[in-house]
Amino acid sequence: MKNIIYMAPMEGLTDFTFRNAYEKIFGKGKIANYFTPFISPNKSEKFLAREIRDIDREHNNGINTVVQVMTNDAKDFIWTARMLYDEYGYNEINLNAGCPSGTVVSKNKGSGMLNEPKLLDKFLDAVFEDDFIRENIKVSVKTRVGVETDTAFPEIIDIYNKYPLEELIVHPRLRTDFYKNDLNLEAYDYAVKNSRSKVVFNGDIFTRKNFLDIKKKFPQTD
């Protein structure tokens, strides 16, 4: 089976300059998708200059780029998707439901969306009720397994299962873990066994051995 490798986004690091340099020197067609640092929609319904530079097709020529969006407002997600499709030609958007930053979580964005699963459900329901989204946009989600505990993770998976996600990218840590503590591989295993969407592993892949160990433990995952 062919290995599928993505480059996860890191704010302030993996901009278009980095992505293009990495692809030219190391990637060479081996990276299936490069994810942009998140766009955070604003009420002006316009992208910031730095966001425009990062998503400009001329700056992403020859690489498969997926734009990540962070919002808890379905209307903001939809206009962002429409603009990305109409003006920049993107037909896949990744929802950030994983960022652990305190300033993000305090606004119930990023992994803060997992605080209230019913609101997450309401958000996704509104997104997929939109005709434009259903007809034109592939929506994937980057998620964690909970905020302070993983007890609600089965409920969160049930919510994701209600919608036709392109894929579910799981970082198997809690929001309170940030990027420390051990990966919760039991929670990831639950996602693999119970998700209706394709599940993609994210987190702590620092070496080839890390990668091969995960592939061995979860051969059905990307």
Regions found by a protein language model. Name each.
Residues 1-222:
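Flavin-dependent oxidoreductase catalytic cores
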